[in-house]
From Swiss-Prot:
UniProt xrefs under NCBIfam families: PRK10792.1, PRK14186.1
Assembly information from the UniProt record: Homodimer.
Gene3D superfamilies: Leucine Dehydrogenase, chain A, domain 1 (3.40.50.10860), NAD(P)-binding Rossmann-like Domain (3.40.50.720)
Protein name as annotated: Bifunctional protein FolD
Family named by the database record: Belongs to the tetrahydrofolate dehydrogenase/cyclohydrolase family.
Coiled coil: none
Function as written in the Swiss-Prot or TrEMBL entry: Catalyzes the oxidation of 5,10-methylenetetrahydrofolate to 5,10-methenyltetrahydrofolate and then the hydrolysis of 5,10-methenyltetrahydrofolate to 10-formyltetrahydrofolate.
Sites where the protein binds NADP(+): 166-168, 191, 232
Organism listed in the record: Edwardsiella ictaluri (strain 93-146)
One matching Pfam family: THF_DHG_CYH
Reactions the enzyme catalyzes: (6R)-5,10-methylene-5,6,7,8-tetrahydrofolate + NADP(+) = (6R)-5,10-methenyltetrahydrofolate + NADPH; (6R)-5,10-methenyltetrahydrofolate + H2O = (6R)-10-formyltetrahydrofolate + H(+)
């Protein structure tokens, strides 16, 4: 059997269109547009690309967008001071600090300085704690985007055996919480997991986020399983591939996300959703 493709580009476009429609309605009602501030420290090329995509998405949906490109020489105190200013800015509903940060700046201290109601990346301990308690507010963008993909494709997750391959703070751990919330029996695997193949082979739903091209062979995929590939890996040839052997897995899975064009577009679309949510839930008068 050949898997159905989960078209992240199309679904992300739908999500952005829904956000844009809501913004237009807000403006028609005499309310302000939501505002997003993006902070980048240094000149990392990949970060520049990501920040650019977020700015374009803001323009598309009608948000107020502010970008702060700080030099490598910026110290932690200066960055925290900017966050404090944005926390107090009534026009800004979401604050995003682009990672990675230069050496000498404490990621945790910076992310925890963002007010939880403006934490549109969903990384603040308060928001992660809410997700853990099954009462989420602002949810991490990539995991929330994956849940949206599953919902929009009509994939019923209740009772599924789900295996999360990767345990990062950005994807793996919050994704496992999202899968629990979606009714899955959830296993998290990581670099010290023994018999990874056995875990993957029994999974009804596989989410892979390890950053290693072709890490999950196609033959490990149980016939009929759903495969969500978060990996974005550029080969020496320039080709971009995921963490799962797509060709092999697509012959066995029922649904699969391509790379590129699967999970990636949903991360930015979900950021737009989170910013709108922050505006309407926490900052409207």
């Amino acid at each position: 059997m050949a898997a159905k493709i989960i078209d992240g580009k199309t679904i992300a476009r739908q999500v952005r269109s829904e956000v844009a429609a809501r913004v237009r309605q807000r403006l028609a009602d005499g309310k302000r547009a939501p505002g997003l501030a993006v902070i980048m420290v240094g000149d990392d090329p990949a970060s520049r690309i990501y920040v650019g995509s977020k700015q374009r998405a803001c323009e598309e949906v009608g948000f107020l967008s502010r970008s702060y490109a700080l030099p490598d020489s910026t110290d932690e105190a200066q960055l925290l001071a900017l966050i404090d200013t944005l926390n107090a800015d009534a026009a800004i509903d979401g604050i995003l600090v682009q990672l990675p940060l230069p050496a000498g700046i404490d990621n945790s201290r910076v992310l925890e300085r963002i007010h939880p109601d403006k934490d549109v990346d969903g990384f603040h301990p308060y928001n992660l704690g809410r997700l853990c308690q099954r009462t989420p507010k602002l949810r991490p963008c990539t995991p929330r985007g994956i849940i949206t993909l599953l919902e929009r494709c009509g994939i019923e997750t209740q009772g599924m055996d789900a295996v999360m391959v990767g345990a990062s703070n950005i994807v793996g751990r919050p994704m496992a919480l999202e899968l629990l919330l979606a009714g899955c029996t959830t296993t998290i695997t990581h670099s010290r997991t023994r018999n990874l193949q056995q875990h993957v082979e029994r999974a009804d739903l596989i989410v892979a986020a390890v950053g290693k091209p072709g890490f999950i062979p196609g033959e490990w995929v149980k016939p009929g399983a759903v495969v969500i590939d978060v990996g974005i890996n550029r080969l020496e040839s320039g080709k971009v591939v995921g963490d799962v052997d797509f060709t092999g897995a697509a012959q066995r899975a029922s649904w699969i996300t391509p790379v590129p064009g699967g999970v990636g577009p949903m991360t930015v679309a979900t950021l737009m959703q989170n910013t709108l949510q922050a505006c309407e839930a926490f900052h409207d008068d």
